[in-house]
């Protein structure tokens, strides 16, 4: 995995955490837990899925769908 791919994954993760804090009023710790324990995060780190190339809004939508199912 290239440094650029790792950086994109990190940025996407940071964006998701920030969006959860801003939109759902979660604490930073709760938002981080939600992201890091999600199926989306596992897929985001898998370079084969290419999810790290998607926009933050799209990823947030996927995370919201995942949370709604649980």
Language-model-detected regions and their locations in the chain:
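C-terminal alpha-helical interaction appendages
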Residues: 1-70
